[in-house]
Amino acid sequence: MSYVKKDLISTKDLSKDDIFSILSLAKDYKALNLEPVKKDPILKGVTVVNAFFENSTRTRTSFEIAAKRLGADAINFSSSTSSTNKGETLIDTIHNIEAMKTDIFIVRHYSSGAAKFVTKNTPSCVVNAGDGCNEHPTQALLDLLTIYEAKGSFSGLSVTIIGDIFHSRVARSNIYAMQTLGIKVKLFGPPMFMQNAEVFGCHICKDMDEAVMGSDAIIMLRIQLERSDGEVAFPSIREYSKYFGLTKTRMQKAKDDVIILHPGPINRGVEINSDVADDARFSSILDQVENGVAIRMAVLKTIYQNKFKA
C-alpha cells in the first residue's frame, strides 16, 4: 500500500497513488463481500470504536460491518447516551475509552477539526467519519470507486457537485481528491450556499442546465439546515426544486451515460426527484452504499497496518 499514515483525516493527505491503492484494495474487498463467507480476519483481536457525536445511518453501519468483516470487535458509541451529556469533554471521553485498550477510533463530530484534534491526543488510529463542515474522506473515496467502476477511468472526466456546497464536508473531500486525480469539478447551488466557493478553484456554473450538461457524474447534496443556525433564508421546497432540483426534465440535457450520486440522506422532491433517484439507468446511489463497506474495509486495514510500520 502507498498510504503510510495511521490516521485518515483529510483527502488532502492522499496522493494519486494513495487513492488508487485504496481503491484497488477496496475492489478486492467488494468481491469478497459477494462471497457466502464475507471475512478477512486481518484485524482479529482489534477493537474498533465508532465514536459518533452526530446522527448517522449509512456511515456508522458501514464502518461497523467493515470492522466485523475484518474480524475486529466493533463497538458503537453514541453521545446521546454518554457522559458528554453530563459535561464530559471530547478528549476525556476518548481517553476513557482508550483506557479500555481501543485500537481504532472512527470519529464523527459536529465540530470541524475534531478528528484532527483527536489524533493529537491518542496513539490509536483515527478515521474521520465527518467533522462538521470540514471533511468526510471515506465518503469521497467510495464516490470515486463508484465513478471509476462506471467509467473505467478518471481521465478526462467532468463531475458536477450541486446543492449546499458551503456546509458540505462531502463536497470538500471530493473536490480535494478529484483535483488530485485531475478530474474537472463544477459547482452549482443557491448563492447563500455557494459562499466563498471560488476558493476551491472549480468552475462555478450559472444555472442548472450548465451544471448538468457535459457532466460524467453528478453528485447531489441535501440542504443542511441544521448547520445554518437559522441564518439562511431558505426558499420554499417548491422554489428550491424548480431552480436547483434534479428532475427528469433536466436529465434530458445530461449525457446519456451520466451517473447520479448522493451521499444521503435524500430529501426526495427537494434536491432530487424520486423518478431520477430510483432510475437504474442513471442512479448509482445504492452502488455508493455497497462500495462504502469495501472502502472502509480497505481504509481500516491500511491504517492499522501502517501503525506498525513506523
Swiss-Prot record:
Write out the transmembrane intervals: none
> EC?
2.1.3.2
Residues annotated as binding carbamoyl phosphate are: 58-59, 108, 136, 139, 264-265
What PROSITE patterns does its record include? CARBAMOYLTRANSFERASE (PS00097)
Which GO biological process categories is it annotated with?
A: 'de novo' pyrimidine nucleobase biosynthetic process; 'de novo' UMP biosynthetic process; amino acid metabolic process
Q: What is the uppermost EC class here? A: transferase
Q: Which GO terms describe its molecular function?
A: amino acid binding; aspartate carbamoyltransferase activity
Q: Where does L-aspartate bind?
A: 86, 169, 222
Q: In which pathway does it act?
A: Pyrimidine metabolism; UMP biosynthesis via de novo pathway; (S)-dihydroorotate from bicarbonate: step 2/3
Organism name: Campylobacter fetus subsp. fetus (strain 82-40)
- Catalysed conversion reaction: carbamoyl phosphate + L-aspartate = N-carbamoyl-L-aspartate + phosphate + H(+)
What InterPro entries does its record include?
Asp/Orn_carbamoyltranf_P-bd, Asp/Orn_carbamoylTrfase, Asp/Orn_carbamoylTrfase_sf, Asp_carbamoyltransf, Asp_carbamoyltransf_Asp/Orn-bd
What does the record note on quaternary structure? Heterododecamer (2C3:3R2) of six catalytic PyrB chains organized as two trimers (C3), and six regulatory PyrI chains organized as three dimers (R2).
- Function field: Catalyzes the condensation of carbamoyl phosphate and aspartate to form carbamoyl aspartate and inorganic phosphate, the committed step in the de novo pyrimidine nucleotide biosynthesis pathway.
Q: What is this protein called?
A: Aspartate carbamoyltransferase catalytic subunit
Does the entry feature the keyword NADP, yes or no? no
Would you tell me the Gene Ontology cellular component terms? cytosol
- Gene3D superfamilies recorded: Aspartate/ornithine carbamoyltransferase
